[in-house]
Regions:
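Conserved C-terminal "lid"/linker of ANL adenylate-forming enzymes
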Residues: 447-450, 482-534
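Conserved ATP-dependent adenylate/AMP-binding module captured primarily in the ANL superfamily
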Residues: 73, 88-116, 131-135, 174-198, ...
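Non-catalytic C-terminal accessory region of glycerolipid acyltransferases
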Residues: 474-475, 521, 740-856
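AMP-binding/adenylate-forming catalytic core of the ANL superfamily
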Residues: 107, 363, 373, 378-379, ...
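Conserved AMP-binding/adenylate-forming core of the ANL superfamily
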Residues: 21-66, 70-74, 91-96, 100, ...
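Conserved AMP-binding/adenylation subdomain of ANL enzymes
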Residues: 172-196, 203-291, 300
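Conserved pre-ATP/AMP-binding loop-to-beta segment of ANL
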Residues: 19, 135-153, 160, 186-196
Length: 856
């Protein structure tokens, strides 16, 4: 309490060894304790000081949400610098304009951004930084509560960035208020430990920072960050990681509602809503009726913390009826960020809660919410006129319209500047009309703006801009909505948006109404309402553009994928890209079966039109072979007969083991493939600490009778299953398909292994080859290395083809050699290029091995 700056809060809360940050890139997972975060932050602070960064100088963070963002944020504050966070979705041009205003000394970039413009600052890549290094005896500058901690830039009404000044005192006022509250409720949280928050708001957003950087340390919670966007994949992450709450914008709740609705179509609809849903009798009833949804999200999941945009009351009621908490908050960047928050133990439906401790608010005569308090920013960076306009009479003019009830609960009506004033002088709130439109069948998204009627440029009328399902008529939608609206709210004109989705802000998902209104006004020649063509084939365009980007050639629907040079890995990468952009799961088998561009377009369009976010069935992979009993059986068999037999038959010479001292597991061992003896000999050559944590890949199609038993006799099925389970048990092996179907699931399973600390052993040739005719390495090794972000250790095996050639059943003794090369950290994103690099590394080991033999 009474801290001088945020650095003191950091020292108070970032010493435990408990888990703090988890990062899931869609395939593998990383985790960092509070103390590891503190050490990484100190390393970054030392690096900034070595670069000459002084107190008050700016560090621009332009990155996706990832642990390194948190390291850099706290490291910047430890160095006395001012953080300038910019969302990963921002354009390079916007970042360049921000840099012109803020003049940062250092620019730290994430993996998903590309800075095209020149900046007069040192540029760092967060994911490539070494977060272990000298940080001892680091002294932070004497920063006070009045010093700037952040400058948060948003796009102003003129399109030019405006920087909101956030001081250490602004942030501490909110932290210390929560800290006092936590003292009272900590005992109630103990049954839910360990608390895990899924952070779906970007860290460049102030509400996202409040959850990850303030609330989580105060509750000793873990923060899970992810690159996943598909609702089904997110639900799987919530269930498997034991997430208690999701921090998000309302659009995420809407996406999850579509997923949950699939589970309750055949179930009685849960009854009750709002506070009554949390009465004991209603709660038990709702939990039972929503049991299928509970299995989808996991039984530890309690609900959502929502901010950044207005929440539809019906959406809130939907989740409350199912027994989930929906805690809604309200705030602005200028208020650091929280103005009000619903008490999770006493939520008020439809309200954004009561005022945060220390915050004062009043409603102006025109309905605008005015705020003041220690959390309110002192103004805009280098813009005194804009500061004066927003902070008149000591009150921050929020631009939002609302009301306060007798108990102090705040309700939001809409945005003042977005309100439509009809010719009759009636105020129309766009959100009210959008709520009705969104309830009309076939409406995927809607935006309501004020526009004059054709031929009359003086008065605004209500116009709707729609994103419709294929075949839905805009005129019919308007007529149906008008039947539900009050007479003064009725829509006078409607337009069909010609693109995939309505434009929204990247961080909070708010509609960009000004952009929508300006574009419709500029393209007024487009037919309004009836007869306006529905959305064009934007999904098909997306496929065409992606193919042309990868091949550099034009493509028609009849173009052959093979003739275009699209490999199986290209198709897998396109599948992952389309899933991320559409938010829908797609059948990998359809992608694998596609032969033309038209086939691919049809597969993508079927997934998008279905609107179903459900995940495809996961392939079968062994997890039982990693339990304690299986590991004991494996170690016993390997030690007693498997490895001694391999050493007896192969009499191996092992070279290059010293290269393993240069890397820590997990890694990918990539080897040439001459014989079925290769994997046992490599295991025999490895030191025990490596051998005990390795998972070799095996040829899935070899076990086709096990995986596709309907095509084989009972004898072949039984024999195949016995061999499969024996190899999976004794070798800890897992199946990899040779075709592209199933590659996505292989990536995810390999990610699970790597996340648990297991190294992988793969044979990128995909088949056994003679020593003098090694095959080309398939791009899968590059895809694994890129997506799992692990080093590759090249391995050359020689002589096994003489001991156990492919055509022989019984081996004969011989001499073999196993050579481990230096670890490779692959940075190119093209899997084919990466695979070629690994192939060349293995070939160089083979050449060195032959030269060594010649010298002997």
């Amino acid at each position: 309490m009474g801290r001088k700056n945020l650095v003191e809060f950091f020292h108070d809360y970032f010493s435990p060894r408990s888990n703090y940050l988890e990062y899931d890139n869609g395939f593998r997972r990383w985790s960092y304790a509070y103390c590891e975060t503190a050490e990484a932050a100190r390393v970054f602070a030392a690096r900034l000081k070595a670069a000459g960064v002084r107190r008050g100088e700016r560090v621009l963070l332009w990155s996706e949400s990832r642990p390194e963002w948190v390291f850099a944020f706290w490291g910047s504050l430890l160095a006395g610098a001012v953080v300038v966070p910019v969302g990963a979705e921002s354009s390079s041009e916007f970042v360049s304009r921000v840099a012109d205003v803020a003049r940062p000394r250092v620019v730290a970039l994430g993996e998903d951004v590309r800075l095209d413009a020149e900046v007069s600052a040192q540029v760092l890549r967060l994911a490539r930084e070494d977060w272990k290094g000298p940080s001892n005896a680091l002294e932070s500058p004497a920063v006070t509560r009045d010093d700037l901690a952040e400058i948060v830039f948003t796009s102003g009404s003129t399109g030019e960035p405006k920087g909101v000044e956030i001081t250490h005192g602004n942030l501490l006022s909110q932290i210390e208020a929560v800290e006092l509250w936590m003292v009272r409720i900590r005992k109630f949280l103990r049954p839910f430990f360990p608390i895990r928050l899924l952070q779906l708001l970007p860290l460049s957003h102030m509400f996202g920072q409040a959850a990850a950087l303030s609330l989580a340390p105060l509750t000793r919670a873990s923060v899970v960050m992810t690159r996943r966007q598909n609702p089904a994949a997110l639900a799987e992450l919530i269930r498997t990681r034991g997430v208690c709450s999701v921090v998000c914008v309302p659009r995420v709740l809407d996406a999850f509602r579509a997923l949950a609705s699939q589970q309750i179509r055949t179930e009685p609809r849960p009854s009750g809503s709002g506070p009554s849903a949390w009465q004991p009798e209603a709660l038990v009833r709702n939990l039972w009726r929503a049991r299928h949804i509970r299995r989808t999200f996991g039984w530890r999941f309690l609900g959502f913390v929502v901010g950044g945009a207005a929440l539809d009351p019906e959406l809130e009621r939907f989740w409350s009826r199912l027994g989930y908490l929906v805690v809604q908050g309200y705030g602005l960047t200028e208020t650091s960020p929280v103005i009000s928050l619903n008490n999770p133990l006493h939520p008020r439906a439809g309200s954004v809660g009561q005022l945060f401790p220390g915050v004062k608010a009043r409603i102006a005569p025109d309905g605008e919410i005015l705020v003041r308090g220690p959390n309110v920013s002192r103004g805009y960076y280098n813009e005194p006129e804009r500061t004066f306009d927003a902070m008149r009479d000591g009150w921050l003019h929020t631009g939002d319209l609302g009301s306060l009830d007798e108990e102090g609960y705040l309700y939001i009506r809409g945005r003042k500047k977005e309100m439509i004033v009809t010719p009759e002088g009636v105020n129309i709130f766009p959100e009210d009309v959008e709520r009705v439109l969104d309830g009309v069948s076939g409406v995927r998204e809607s935006a309501v703006v004020g526009l004059p009627l054709l031929g009359d440029d003086r008065q605004e009328h209500v116009h709707a801009v729609l994103e419709l399902a294929p075949g839905r008529d805009a005129g019919e939608v308007m007529a149906e909505a008008n039947r539900r609206l009050e007479s003064y709210q009725r829509i006078r004109g409607v337009f069909v948006w010609p693109e995939e989705a309505l434009p929204r802000t990247g961080q909070t998902g708010k509609l960009k109404r000004a952009e929508i209104r300006d574009r419709i006004a500029a393209e007024r020649a487009a037919k309004p309402v009836n007869g306006h063509p529905a959305r064009g084939s934007t999904t098909a365009d997306m496929v065409t553009e992606e193919i042309e980007r990868r091949t550099g050639r034009g493509a028609s629907a009849e173009s052959s994928l093979d003739e275009l040079g699209l490999s199986s890995v290209d198709r897998v990468e396109m599948l992952l890209e389309f899933e991320g952009r559409s938010g829908q799961s797609m059948e990998e088998s359809e992608f694998a079966a596609a032969r033309t561009v038209g086939d691919l377009k049809a597969a993508v369009e079927r997934a998008v039109k279905s609107g179903e976010p459900g995940a495809a069935e996961r392939a079968r992979f062994p997890s039982w072979n990693r339990n304690s009993l299986a590991r004991l059986v494996r170690e016993t068999n390997l030690s007693l007969w498997v490895l001694p037999l391999a050493r007896f038959l192969g009499r191996p010479t092992v070279e290059g083991l010293q290269n393993l001292n240069r890397v820590k597991p997990p890694v990918i061992f990539a080897a040439n493939h001459e014989s079925n003896l290769d994997a046992p000999l490599i295991l025999a050559a490895l030191p025990g600490e490596w051998r005990r944590r390795i998972a070799p890949a095996m040829y899935k199609e070899f076990f086709d009778p096990h995986f596709s038993p309907e095509n084989y006799s009972l004898t072949r099925k039984l024999l195949s299953s016995i061999v499969y389970y024996l190899i999976a048990l004794i070798g800890n092996a897992f199946p990899i398909p040779q075709e592209e179907a199933g590659v996505r699931d292989v990536l995810r399973y390999a990610g699970e292994l790597v996340s648990e600390g297991w190294s992988l052993l793969i044979f990128p040739e995909g088949e056994r080859r003679p020593a003098d005719r090694h095959g080309a390495f398939r791009p899968g090794v590059g895809l694994l290395a890129d997506r799992l972000e692990v080093p590759v250790v090249p391995v050359c095996v020689e002589g096994t083809g003489q001991v156990l050639p492919p055509q022989r059943v019984l081996p004969r003794r011989g001499r073999t050699r196993v050579i481990f090369g230096p670890p490779m950290r692959l940075e190119d994103r093209d899997p084919k290029v990466l695979a070629k690099q690994v192939q060349e590394a293995v070939a160089s080991l083979a050449a060195a091995g032959f030269a060594s033999l010649a010298r002997r």
